[in-house]
Amino acid sequence: MNLDDKSLFLDAMEDVQPLKRATDVHWHPTRNQRAPQRIDTLQLDNFLTTGFLDIIPLSQPLEFRREGLQHGVLDKLRSGKYPQQASLNLLRQPVEECRKMVFSFIQQALADGLRNVLIIHGKGRDDKSHANIVRSYVARWLTEFDDVQAYCTALPHHGGSGACYVALRKTAQAKQENWERHAKRSR
């Protein structure tokens, strides 16, 4: 600090007096301070519904096939002939958390170009158990995705009635590669 700066500082501090007892100062935190919430932009687009639900009885296996999909595809899916490329475990999760997880999982699977995934929703002992409510919501949510072609109850070694296989639509790139592969064979 040069001499001019020091004299300016002393002039500015001329009438300042030190606190006599600094221990008497207490800071009170302001009330209703909320931690900034991180907005999950992916969840802003979440279209999955959580309204009124028709509970699917445990005795009824989960099964859905989009119109236009060949019956053979569902048969192969049901018999576990398609390898599972990813799985999602929803066991003991609240319904709203399951909703977010299913949405993110399917979106990520589509972005990664996956075709077949497994969702483990659990199974309860009665129709109104939490696991069966989640199971019923999963069945509803999967039909709300245009890119879900089919789903069905998994085989026992993959979770049986506590899980389901999901077949996703091919991406445009996968369709193009498939077309090129088959076009080369026909020449």
Swiss-Prot record:
Residues 88-169 form the Smr domain. Keywords: DNA-binding, Endonuclease, Hydrolase, Nuclease. Its EC number is 3.1.-.-. SUPFAM superfamilies: SMR domain-like. PROSITE patterns: SMR. The keyword Glycosyltransferase does not apply. InterPro entries: Endonuc_SmrA, Smr_dom, Smr_dom_sf. GO terms for molecular function: DNA binding; DNA endonuclease activity. It comes from the Bacteria. Has DNA endonuclease activity. Binds DNA. This is Probable DNA endonuclease SmrA. The lineage of its organism: Bacteria, Pseudomonadati, Pseudomonadota, Gammaproteobacteria, Enterobacterales.
